[in-house]
Amino acid sequence: MGQCVTKCKNPSSTLGSKNGDRDPSNKSHSRRGASHREEQVPPCGKPAGDILVNGTKKAEAATEACQLPTSSGDAGRESKTNAEESSLQRLEELFRRYKDEREDAILEEGMERFCNDLCVDPTEFRVLLLAWKFQAATMCKFTRKEFFDGCKAISADSIDGICARFPSLLTEAKQEDKFKDLYRFTFQFGLDSEEGQRSLHREIAIALWKLVFTQNNPPVLDQWLNFLTENPSGIKGISRDTWNMFLNFTQVIGPDLSNYSEDEAWPSLFDTFVEWEMERRKREVEGRGTLSSGQEGLCPEEQT
């Protein structure tokens, strides 16, 4: 896998529209003037000359209404927008710190510096969790979109902020549904998308199985990985179906493999594994029996 897991939003007026009582002495004057001129309508749509009870002209009140300060809700939205803009600026600065000089992405060298600043090893489980949250498509690479969307997903815009999210990510990965999503992501993550791979190389699959089961190591995992390691010629690659079904295998098949049935719809590689493991255990038992038989005919001094 190389040196890293990841390739590692117009305030409205607060005044009502009701007209105030008019001064009775103004009635005749208003009628006489109506035929000579039209009332001027100010920008807020209030007829000029209308007087409120407190003596203020409606036009003036309307103008003041247009100039009222924003409501607390508008101020809150503005504050939120400013905070989002500041966060985006910090993310931009953080991304530029690690991005490649030619490509608008964080590549292997930048990834190593990123992990170093996070105080994590590029090959450890926490980096896989980060790649999962970033939905990284390729090992040792974060595109701009992956980096920005991922940091937003975990509500972090700084090195300290990302580090502070690790404990909650580790806890989240222990949930059955979340782990299943992480597990399936890991297969796709291990593929070389640029080469159009459809199956994992055996060595990559072994490393990723060890990594993804960091917090919950099933009893049969070690035997499974030994089988893959000792039979390189018979295993060209690990398909998506085999990868996905292995999680089911660890959940329903006991460590002694006694409840495994070839009649069920398991991948053929599982049949081969169970047969291989049973033979290995048989030889192990026979070997212990032979050793015990050989020691029975020896004198106490010879046994020691």
From Swiss-Prot:
Gene3D superfamilies in the cross-refs: Cullin, PONY binding domain, EF-hand
Expression tissues: Highest levels of expression are in the testis. Very low levels of expression in the heart, brain, skeletal muscle, kidney, liver, spleen, lung and ovary.
An individual GO BP term: negative regulation of G1/S transition of mitotic cell cycle
Coiled coil: none
Pfam families hit by this protein: Cullin_binding
Main location: membrane
GO molecular function: cullin family protein binding
GO cellular component, one term: nucleoplasm
Region feature (Disordered): 1-87, 284-304
Domain DCUN1 span(s) in chain numbering: 86-278
Lipid attachment points (N-myristoyl glycine): G2
Localization annotation: Cell membrane; Cytoplasm; Nucleus; Cytoplasm, Perinuclear region
PROSITE patterns: DCUN1
Keywords on record: Cell membrane, Cytoplasm, Lipoprotein, Membrane, Myristate, Nucleus
Matching PANTHER family: DCN1-LIKE PROTEIN 3, RP42 RELATED
Assembly behavior: Part of a complex containing DCUN1D3, CUL3 and RBX1. Interacts (via the DCUN1 domain) with the unneddylated cullins: interacts with CUL1, CUL2, CUL3, CUL4A, CUL4B and CUL5; these interactions promote the cullin neddylation and the identity of the cullin dictates the affinity of the interaction. Interacts preferentially with CUL3; this interaction triggers the relocalization of CUL3 to the cell membrane where CUL3 is neddylated. Interacts (via DCUN1 domain) with RBX1.
Domain notes: The DCUN1 domain, also known as PONY domain, mediates the interaction with different cullins. The DCUN1 domain mediates the interaction with the N-terminally acetylated NEDD8-conjugating E2s enzyme leading to the NEDD8 transfer from N-terminally acetylated NEDD8-conjugating E2s enzyme to different cullin C-terminal domain-RBX complexes; the neddylation efficiency correlates with the DCUN1D5-cullin and DCUN1D5-E2 interaction affinities. This domain is also involved in CAND1-, cullins- and RBX1-binding.
Described purpose of this protein according to its UniProt entry: Contributes to the neddylation of all cullins by transferring NEDD8 from N-terminally acetylated NEDD8-conjugating E2s enzyme to different cullin C-terminal domain-RBX complexes and may play a role in the cell cycle progression by regulating the SCF ubiquitin E3 ligase complex, after UV damage. At the cell membrane, can promote and as well inhibit cullins neddylation.
Name the record gives this protein: DCN1-like protein 3
Taxonomic source organism: Mus musculus (Mouse)
